Design a protein with these regions (language model features):
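Aromatic-residue-lined binding/catalytic grooves and analogous aromatic/hydrophobic interfacial grooves
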Residues: 1-210
Length: 210
């Protein structure tokens, strides 16, 4: 993920940034402008419609391990570390990059992949990264065109249609998994219907618009 904050002339941009997760984790700084968050997913999460004493179960050494890195680039100004946050004060633009790895495959390579991610994230070029992203999704997005008679309601429906296509494409990039009920956009620990792959109909429905 690449985020660009643009500052207006004669204005300073002030912000603080951190990484958080509902999953058990630990975080630390790396380089001068980076934060790394590492954790391990639970082995079981009860669906939200189940009532139980321990809905989220962890087991040491089990569950998918993950690491998320965040790195800040500025051209001048001040970036400093305090507690678990990065504080930024600059009159110039700010670029924030977020990247992650897991041990979903090749568990033995997790730590080397994590270290490579921490190194590579420090050298991302925003415009190059933006172009790479646009090239990937446009290859699928531009395969179809929908034209409907203009009315305010139709315009909203058209925007929602294309927005849903964009989200679906970005959560199904080559080398990743197909979307489940919420795809990579799920932010719940106990998601509706457990954010499952319900392949009797819902997984197929995700791709009807494709």
């Amino acid at each position: 993920m690449a985020i660009h904050y643009h500052t207006s002339p004669n204005c300073n941009l002030e912000m603080s940034i951190t990484l958080e997760s509902e999953i058990k984790h630990k975080s630390a700084f790396f380089a001068e402008n980076g934060i790394i968050l590492e954790g391990q997913a639970p082995i079981y999460v009860a669906p939200p419609y189940y009532s139980c004493e321990v809905p989220v179960v962890y087991e040491e050494g089990q569950g998918i391990r993950f690491a998320i890195g965040l790195y800040v680039q500025t051209n001048g100004g001040n970036v400093y570390q305090q507690a678990d946050k990065l504080f930024i004060n600059t009159p110039n633009d700010v670029y924030i990059y977020v990247s992650g790895v897991t041990d979903f495959k090749q568990k033995e390579l997790f730590f080397s992949k994590r270290n490579c991610m921490m190194e590579n994230i420090q050298h991302i070029q925003y415009e190059k990264q933006k172009k790479a992203h646009m090239d990937v999704y446009a290859n699928y997005f531009d395969r179809m065109h929908l034209d409907i008679n203009y009315t305010p309601d139709n315009e909203l429906a058209l925007k929602m249609f294309h927005y849903a296509r964009y989200l679906m494409i970005c959560s199904s990039v080559p080398g990743s998994q197909c979307t489940n009920l919420q795809g990579i956009w799920n932010h719940h620990m106990r998601a509706p219907w457990s954010s499952n792959y319900t392949v009797n109909i819902n997984t197929e429905m995700n791709y009807w618009m494709a």
